[in-house]
Amino acid sequence: MALFSDVFRQTNAYAMQLGGILGLYWCLGLLCMVAGFQVSFLHSLVPVIILGAPLLGYFLARYFEGQVRADAPVDFVRAFLFCYLMYLYATVILGGVTYIYFTMFDEGSLIEANIAQLQRPEMKELLSSPQIQSQINEALTTTGFKSLEEMFRSVTPLMLAANIVDLNLLIGVILSIPTAFFIKTKPIRK
């Protein structure tokens, strides 16, 4: 029987390796989102990558279960721990890449592209509806900004990276529960 520390060490090692693969996949999604403002085809890949991420997470977790099954059966707790750690390491990679990209390379182009989207006629029409306008006015009053453009320009690279990390940590916990349920080692029936 394996010791808990050995099982944890093995689970953590696999989570780091496979979380790295998942993190690079998420970075590909970030690249498609950012480059999609210049090449619209790449923007259309973003939903595919987002929807494919849980599937990739499932297949990576299934790979983990297949690799360690002989050492010790993977119960729900170990499967959840692996999945959570895998998503955690992927989030760290994506957060770091996001911060580096927006600090060193973006130079505000993503914010400017979003501001340009606000100037499109269909967006102006949508934003001028009474319900949306009241929400915008409430947000501007609460935050002290004079316009949406000013609010967008106030977003720092650290804020973008922190939001991505927060969101992905939450999603990681949520996705870890069903993934762990499906990948745990099934008992052999005699």
Model-derived regions: residue spans:
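Functional transmembrane-helix hotspots
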Residues: 96-135
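Alpha-helical transmembrane segments of multipass membrane proteins
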Residues: 21, 25-29, 53, 90-98, ...
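Transmembrane alpha-helical insertion/packing segments
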Residues: 1-70
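Individual transmembrane alpha-helix segments
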Residues: 141-170
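Alpha-helical transmembrane segments with an aromatic anchor "belt"
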Residues: 67-88
